[in-house]
Amino acid sequence: MGLIGHSADDGIGATPAVGWAGVGTVTLRELATDRAHRAARLLDRHLLVLVTVGHGQLELDFRPLQCRPGTLVWARRGQMVRYGGQPGLDAIVVCWDTSSVADAPDGAPLSDGYWQLAGEDEDAVINEVSQLVVDIQRHRSGVLAEELLRHQLTVLLLRIALLPGGATPDETGAYARFRRAVEEDFARTRRVEEYAERMGYSVRTITRACLNATGRSAKQVIDDRVTLEAKRLLAAADAPIADVGRRLGFPEPTNFGRFFHREVGVSPGAFRQAQRAIPVTPAGSTRVPLPRELPVDAAGAETARSWGRA
């Protein structure tokens, strides 16, 4: 498993195409026909999944999300996704490349990214997504068409940001700033003091902000983020466990093993083996190398819940 968007030369199967304008759509059923998409994958672009028919699960960062018509999931760059492939479950998947659609909102950094739409909210999102699908199929080139598709995506994402739970009251407060700083540097340092000095806060202020937001200390928030990335890479890449540890700031494999066992309750090897044993429907999986670098969502997109232990 690897980062969505790499070429076949990277050992990674076909991925959702973003199209000539940097925006694309595909159905979940179409993805499920590709063996590479039925195993755990790391995303290197944002995906919106709007369930249209059936019932089942979509796994996002080891959280099973119950899906039925009207379920909306925003999966962000760097997250681990497992589509499931349950018979009868289908969805429209909207994908976009933030490098080519630079003005597209990243979504609230602390948002859950999971909604069960109803009423006017459901109608509005369905209408926006449906029109985007139609226009992507109709318009294949041209400056005006490119602007149309990008603006439609922006409107859709802004509408989602206005959903309940789509925005966070204080995106500039101590906790939000700390989360962004951790997202940028968790593989280099796990010391709260370094983050506090960089941000101009005291350790006590950051710890208090983390406790108020999550019930966990600042050090635990950092460790949760490192643990999540370790779980992602162990589940989704085939690099030796020692390489995963070094990528996350553990020069010595034994130190990484102790850290992971303390946080998860099992060794890195046992966790990887358990993830590999998860059945894929239909049968099949793809093994690919460790990504060359950790994907970092500039908005710090992972949520407090997704940082917790699975």
Name each model-derived stretch.
Residues 70, 206, 255-260:
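Short hydrophobic/aromatic patch on the recognition helix
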Residues 150, 166-199, 221-239, 274, ...:
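A short, Lys/Arg-enriched amphipathic alpha-helix from helix-turn-helix/homeodomain DNA-binding modules
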Residues 20, 25-110:
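N-terminal regulatory/effector-sensing and dimerization cores
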Residues 108-164, 179-180:
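Amphipathic alpha-helical segments enriched in hydrophobic/aromatic residues interleaved with Lys/Arg
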Residues 1-22, 34-35:
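N-terminal low-complexity or simple alpha-helical regulatory segments
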Residues 213-253, 273-310:
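Terminal helix-turn-helix DNA-binding modules in bacterial transcription factors
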Residues 193, 204, 240-242, 253-254, ...:
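Residues within helix-turn-helix
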Residues 135-141, 159-165, 178-191, 210, ...:
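Basic, amphipathic alpha-helical hairpins
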